[in-house]
Design a protein with these regions (language model features):
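N-terminal small/polar loop signature for handling phosphorylated ligands or for N-terminal nucleophile
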Residues: 38, 42, 50-115, 198-256
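An N-terminal, well-structured beta->alpha segment
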Residues: 2-75, 101, 154-183
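Proline/glycine-rich low-complexity loops and linkers
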Residues: 89, 133-166, 170, 257-332, ...
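Phosphate-binding and adjacent anionic-ligand microenvironments
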Residues: 242, 278, 282-445
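Short glycine-rich phosphate-binding loop at a beta-alpha junction
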Residues: 48-56, 80, 182-184, 284-290, ...
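Gly/Ser/Thr-enriched, mixed-charge loops and adjacent short helices
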Residues: 3-10, 22, 115-238
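Gly/Ser/Thr-rich loops at beta-strand to alpha-helix junctions
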Residues: 57-62, 110-111, 188-193, 250-251, ...
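Buried hydrophobic positions in well-ordered alpha/beta secondary-structure cores of metabolic enzymes
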Residues: 17, 53, 90, 103, ...
Length: 445
């Protein structure tokens, strides 16, 4: 027997990367998250089934995990709880366990005051816009709740961590392949704080872990890929060969060279593309975004590799990768996707693929970066009410700035996760770039 409840509608909650906000404010309240879970259950598993739920280490994750568990079980679904787990690992487990869908509780690189939800389909990929619209429309309908005899049940999966680690380490064929490498890994006090050091140690590396002591409040605080200065100093100070800087949910990565040089997403893409040219099956196509450095595009062209550009966001990158039949894609923020292995950006896997090349090709970071010449890129943010800025005005601002910039380019865009207007300027002249930004800021204000 089904029991119905009344509910009001609240739409437009999905942003560029799922649902995100300040904890305690719409949409990140227990009440709304519970309702969203019920709506997702109706759309993605109307006949019942299993849902995988994982989270990062922020304090509010426990609260939202409980809310999701209750709402999904009340919707007649079995729930597999992973606890703190890297986003790409939740993606892998969702597909590996044949779940109907997965839910990631994380605000990625944001501080502990924020949290969010990312919903995955049965393949472990982020749901597309059509499904998001269906879920939002479902919010305005009466949810169906179950009586005791048709409720789901919640369990924890003790094998998930080992299965994910085996999957990642499967890129190597030899035991202890990294035994000659000394590596610093910064887990941002986030979701990979157990898995990353264990994985690297199991592969034979000499591991120095930092940012691996989460307390619920220190995720992304002065550490990880968003605050890279700490590990950039640590690597040369300890004479390490490499540094790996993950973000809070471990779906993105920056690397640090032995001299403390920071290697961002565009550089990692170049290295992986260069490595792929040794593979006769590589079709010489990769996907970046509108923000990808034009110097990378030119350097890849010199190697006979074509770069396609999507809108910002790893979901858009993946979509264009499918359309162009590209294996490799990513963003300068460190989201790197390799479809030979996973449809999710995976920081640890990306780092291991670079380390595998260093070991097996007997090469170095410097040699892998040879031939890459990036154009200086300057990024600015203007905090503003985005609802008052029309898309036409943003296009006008961008066109005007590009007219005033010779030998470079300007991008003006709305942030999908924060009330910010983001401006990117590529120019050899930093003073001119700053002037352009000040001009745009004055017009916005």
């Amino acid at each position: 027997r089904m029991v119905k409840k009344n509910m009001t509608s609240e739409l437009k909650v999905f942003g560029t990367d799922g649902v995100r906000g300040k904890v305690g404010e719409h949409p990140m309240t227990v009440d709304f998250v519970s309702r969203l879970a019920g709506a997702a259950a109706s759309v993605l598993a109307p006949q019942g089934g299993t849902v995988v739920v994982g989270k990062d280490t922020r304090i509010s994750g426990y609260m939202f995990e409980s809310a999701l568990e209750a709402a999904l079980v009340a919707s007649g679904l079995d729930v597999m709880l992973l606890g703190p787990f890297p986003t790409p690992g939740i993606s892998f487990t969702t597909k590996d366990c044949n779940a109907n869908f997965g839910v990631i509780i994380s605000a990625s690189h944001n501080s502990y005051e924020y949290n969010g939800l990312k919903i995955l389909n049965s393949l472990g990929e982020k749901i597309d816009k059509r499904i998001e619209i269906d879920i939002e429309n479902q919010l305005s309908k009466d949810p169906i709740t179950h009586t005791a005899d048709t409720l789901g049940r919640a369990t924890r999966n003790p094998d998930a961590r080992g299965n994910y680690m085996n999957f990642i380490s499967g890129i190597f064929t030899q035991p202890q392949p990294l035994r000659k490498i000394k590596v610093v890994v910064d887990c941002s006090h986030g979701a990979a704080y157990k898995i990353a050091p264990r994985m690297l140690s199991a592969l034979g590396a000499d591991v120095i872990p930092i940012g691996c002591s989460p307390n619920g409040y220190n995720i992304n605080l002065n550490c990880g890929s968003t605050n890279i200065e700490t590990i950039a100093k640590t690597v040369p100070a300890l004479s390490a060969d490499l540094g790996i800087a993950l973000d809070g949910d471990a779906d993105r990565v920056f690397l640090i060279g032995p001299e403390g040089n920071i290697i961002e997403g565009d550089q990692i893409l170049y290295m992986l593309a260069s490595i792929a040219t040794n593979n006769h099956q590589f079709n010489s196509k990769i996907v970046g975004t509108i923000l990808t450095n034009s110097g990378l595009e030119k350097s890849l062209k010199n190697k006979g590799i074509q770069l396609y550009r999507s809108e910002v966001g790893d979901k858009n990158v993946l979509q264009l990768m499918r359309q162009t039949d590209s294996i490799l894609g990513g963003e300068n923020s460190g989201h790197i996707i390799n479809l030979d292995h996973s449809p999710s950006g995976d920081g640890l896997l990306t780092a291991l693929l670079v380390m595998k090349a260093i070991v097996e090709l007997d090469t170095s970071i410097g040699e892998l970066l040879h031939g890459l010449e990036l154009v200086p890129q300057f990024n600015y943010n203007i905090e503003t009410d985005l609802t008052k800025l029309s898309n036409d005005l943003i296009t006008e601002l961008s066109d005007e700035a590009n007219t005033n910039l010779h030998n470079g380019r300007v991008l003006v865009r709305k942030s999908g996760t924060e009330p910010m207007l983001r401006i990117t300027v590529e120019s050899l002249d930093e003073v001119h770039a700053q002037k352009l930004f000040e001009s745009i800021k004055a017009q916005v204000n």
